[in-house]
Amino acid sequence: MKKVRFWAVLAIGFMSVMSIKAQGQRMNEFQNEFSKYQTQYRELMHSGKHKEAMAPLASCIAMLDTTTIFKVSPIPEAAILEQKGLLYYDYACCYALVGQKKQALAALEQSVLLGYKDYNNMVNDNDLRSLRKDKKYQALLAQVNDRQPLSVLKKSAPYAKDAARQDILFRYQPKESKNLRMVRDYFKLDSVAGQGDELSKIINLLHFAHDNIRHDGGNQAFAELDAIDLYNYYKTTGKGVNCRQLAISLCEMYLSMGIPARYVTCMPADSLDYECHVINTVWSEQLQKWLYIDPTMDAWVTDENGTMLSIAEVRERLINDQPLVLCETANWNHESQQTKEYYLETYMAKNLYYFVCKKLNRFNPESLYRNNDPADDVRLIPVGFVNNNWKCDTTTDPEVFWAKPKKEQ
């Protein structure tokens, strides 16, 4: 059981909000008390005192039952309830470890009712091994299996033509604009891209961004959102940038080389899941299609014949159980290799439910400090999908959303 990770999710969430929003004394008091119980729980579990570890668990659940902290913070009430489900899962493990099977199953049922969805953890968790032959456990496991990202993606509704949104137009800043010339010259991208064909240039630029700007999903870089500032932020502080900032950086590099590109926010179906991933879609004149490019993982995807695929094609092939080949270079910060089973079939399957892009793709698209109005967003969603977390122009038409880039006149 990944107890430390489950507890850390809530604690880190509150700490992040406090550091950014400085919500005041009440937030501090809540986090300090929660951290106290967290420490007690970890120490008791580490020493094998499973029965005693249930007391701090109960205290944390009671805190979540009575708190109204969500009213003074950006944390939604539903997210707090989801975290309570994780605590009930830990409760189930404690009961199972002390031989109280009935109570363990009741706690596990409560966890599943609150939305627990980590199937791989549940099926492999040795803390629950005494429950595995029980019919109730098996029924709960089946419910959790239905929540697996690939299962959810396969049940998504289809897309549909959208005659009302044919006016949506994506634009790409010309490479000779002053700021993009600055990006190209600063990074010496003509040399980085090399003298090979278009696909080799696209991949070389991907490797360059991945190798020279570290990823840190938990860090919101204190910098302007452009490739030069983000690169210098990392080089100066040693702190990585998040996936959105990394994808913005690579998008500017492609645009500066005259290669149409967007950064794409890949979103999950679950409105309570605030974890998403941001990658790039890059236009290939050579293949006459968009390509799936992920600078966080130094990744692209091909079919069984070695042809590079688009984001739309990766999504479709996941749904239809068609072959997908993850490139051999796929890795996180050169520290952990990525596998198709986890990266594509689990992580990206969760985050390929719907997509958001900017209409205007340019240098510094989301300025924090400059007088630079943000471009409008566009969503691509399946028919009938309802999620108000991202309010912007919306279409169900993939031909509109993934339209071939038009050359600037």
PLM-predicted stretches and their roles:
Residues I319-Q409:
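Low-complexity, Gly/Ser/Thr/Pro-rich intrinsically disordered linker/tail segments
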Residues M1-M27:
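Bacterial Sec-dependent N-terminal signal peptides
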Residues Q25-N28, M63-L81:
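Flexible helix-coil transition and linker loops at the boundaries of alpha-helical arrays
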Residues I248-Q322:
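Hydrophobic/aromatic-rich core segments of domains that either
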Residues S156-V241:
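Secondary-structure boundary elements
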